[in-house]
Amino acid sequence: MPEKAGLMLTPIALIAAGVLLCPPVVVVADDATIEQIVVVAHKDERSIRDIAANVTVLSRAQLNDELATSINDVFRYVPGVDHEAAGNRFGTEGINIRGIGGNRVAIVVDGVPLSDHFSVGSFSNATRDFIDAGLIENIEVLHGPASALYGSSAIGGVVAVKTPDPVDLVGAGRNGGDLLVTWRDLDDSFQSQALLGLGDRSLGLTAGVSWRSGHEVDSAAAPDSLDTRDSDRRTLLLKLVADDQLGNTWRAGLIHQEAHTLSDLSSMLGSGRYRSTTALEGNDRYQMDLINVAYEFGSPGAWVDSGVARGYFEVADIEQKTLDERGNAGTPVSIDRLFAFEQEIRGLELNLWKDLESSRTAHRLGLGLDYRERRTEEYRDGLSTNMDSGEQTNVLLGEVFPLRDFPISSTTEIGAYVEDTLSFGDWTVIAALRADRFELSPSQDPMYLEDYPFAELVSLTESDVSPKLGVIYKITPGTDIYLQYSHGFRAPPYADANISLDVPLFNFRAIPNPDLKSESSDGFDLGFRWQGVASSARLSVFHTRYEDFIESKVRLGIDPESGRLLFQSQNLDETRIEGIEASWSVRRGAFGFDGSAYYARGVNKENNEHLNSVGPPQIVLGVSWDSKDERRGLRLKSTLTDGWSDRDETSGELFKPAGHAVFDLFLTQEIGSRTILRAGLHNLTDRTYWNWSDIRGLSPNDPILPYLAQAGRSASVSLNVNW
């Protein structure tokens, strides 16, 4: 496939382009500027200027104005934060921050962690796509390692989702609501969501429902797509918030989500391993239930000023069925496959804060305890039917089904942290220390032990201490710089420790690794922030070194006893990721100018090759106009992405998506006092392009490439009624 001329965006060019496209700014501090408050960095509310890290905040209003309906839309204008894709069938796997993704990024909804991602082969993929864009109040993204507060699962960062409280909908009254209907041309999808807030600040209820139905995404490179994908997702949200007689607050929440997707993957037929396949269809079901109870307590002057205790339970249940008809094979067969994945998470969390002040200094002390259990069960089944004789067998490629890829496993994580924020004069010093203990306990699983008699079950007990130290210096009332060091930690996952696979037909075998070590990271962030009357700017330079990075299914060589080619999860010596993040905004009368930029480079120090999880440089620029009465607005967004060339191709040549510039136009129009009409035109120039995260690992001649291109010019529209 020929490569189009790409954009050449160096880090300096990225930032320079943004500066040149914005009008000059006079740096004048404004003490009255409303400061942005975030929770994710310290688990309590703080001004973003009191945090020694880079945090991105996305609000419900912003997502509505951008007509976001999926997790792919949520982060499309946040350089350095990407969705991880799994082809036309499975959709979004997870979220990537600064080149680190998968289960190394903690995703929490109302403080509750979401289930893990796990995949094996081409027909089994338990994704983490459980975030419903229709029921988000705001999203906070903490860039970089965050193990000092969040433990083993946050070595790559944190994505914290908050659903609406009743007060977010009720306002000053006793009831309120929000109804939103959105249609998108690119996948012919409809999303309807309704949020209702009842009560007041002392006793309130949020009730929300969201329903989304859509089809395959149109591809600009394959206008007559062979693939089809029909999806349906429904989500229910209930949240009760009540104050007791002591002035403390109780919260109880329930989220239920279920999704069903039918896919026809005809684009893969007739080539490679599917050269004899005449039909390939998927039937996938997903369900997630989350229960959360929290108690916010305390009063100034007591032994603690404030605190929150939380208990939660979450279960994810995924079932994926595949029909693989091989009508052109020497012996035509119809193969039915089943993949099932279930994970239960239950946990307790306690966070306490105390303020201490003297004439010259102020301390904010934090103390936290975490307890979390996960139980994970997975299996695959298969049945091959001779299309001529009707004869059936459960042996496929030498594998005898049903089977597990790892035993039923339980993990226990216990963590405790202490944090002190010391302020004196223009200086703030933040020191934190967390201790973690991790236990992996595989069960004596009869199915697993029968399938893999060569495997020895691996039990693990790991512990680590994660320090963090940050310094903030306020140069002026509106300007500050910060420097932070943070240590990250990730215990060996259950799947990597005990992964097993045995395919006699191809003569290879994957075996457990009892010697896996915990991953660790040491990250440094140097940042600058400025906040003016109607303008702001941020710049962050980061460098993170990862040691003992776990790579799944590393080739070991031939086993002299069995003659099989062996694979095993292994620790890499060292990898490094470093880069720059920047953002800015300027308001001049009716016009606004904003932008953000990202550049990163990742290197595997074992072979000095690039990391393929680190995407290309990117810059996002925006120009907006609002009428004097603020009832009408226009926004033009441009996304400039460089060609993706810094990659490891030692295992074979990879497809190189060209650089591209994409322009989107949005209109917001108020109709009356309670209704808002929004419309969007996407990819105005009808550009054919690929997102890097959609085509990772694919060769230049992969037949599925045309079907993974983004949509050409498309439209979307929404109608929003609130009261």
Walk through the language-model features, giving the residues of each.
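Extracytoplasmic beta-strand/coil segments of soluble accessory domains associated
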Residues: 40, 72, 76-116
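Short acidic/polar hinge/loop motifs at secondary-structure boundaries
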Residues: 114-143
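Transmembrane beta-barrel wall of Gram-negative outer-membrane proteins
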Residues: 183-213, 223-264, 283-298, 359, ...
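Flexible loop and strand-edge segments within Gram-negative outer membrane beta-barrel domains
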Residues: 229, 247-304, 316-343
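Surface-exposed extracellular loop regions of Gram-negative outer-membrane beta-barrel proteins
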Residues: 258-262, 266-273, 317, 439-450, ...
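Outer-membrane beta-barrel signature, preferentially recognizing the C-terminal barrel domain
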Residues: 273-300, 405-411, 457-466, 470, ...
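Gram-negative outer-membrane beta-barrel transporters
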Residues: 354, 359, 365, 423-429, ...
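Signature of Gram-negative outer-membrane beta-barrel scaffolds
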Residues: 362-478, 502, 596
